[in-house]
Amino acid sequence: KLNIYKNFPDEKSFDNLIEKTFTNYYDQWNADYIIERGDWITPYNLKLLQKYFKNNKIKIVILVRDVLDILGSMLNVCRRNAEFYINRQYEFSDKSTVIFEKKEELAEIIMHRDNYIYTVLYSINNLLKENTFKDYIFVEYNDLVSKPDITLKNIYNFFDIKHFKHDFNNVKEFEVNGIKYEDSVFGGKLHKLKTGKLERQEYQIKVPQRVVDKYSGLEMWRKINNEK
């Protein structure tokens, strides 16, 4: 396959195109403030931000949660949705290579280094270890659910934007410009939100102790906060 860029390396024009990505994407959004959601803390993505937005203040909020809770939440989606992509990965796997019960095998797929949770964990670890980018805060999921008003005010203060009064008794599904998440592509409801009053949902997922032992204590951001 030919490398077109090397054939005509117009780097300045490509840089100009990339620098205007956010401006062009959000050009028709009717909003005073837009907080971009994405995997911006991966080492590669963060370098891109720093390269193309070096004249802007980059601030990142990192939503974190107990890793075992995340794993349990994903296993709960597996339990409720037979066609969920994690279940399908398991069903298509070579069963002659399987040594654990199904639930443990599903946990291994979810936590695999090529999947999302591991990507976020190594990105946080790299962020803390390199310590070259410091304009970020961690927001605990438990704080967001148990004391949302205080937590959101902290986020607004971090971004230096005015506070917005929320109705935590009337939480709605996320929708913007008439568009909602279409989770059928995943085979399960990844973004399904309990509408109405904001409160933590409890459910029980039993997994072998090996799984608990393996994925306990991975919340490295808490160790840093405790050291401070």
List each language-model region with its residue ranges.
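Short catalytic/ligand-binding loop motif for oxyanion handling, primarily in non-cytosolic enzymes
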Residues: T42-N45, L68-S73, V145-P148, K172-E175
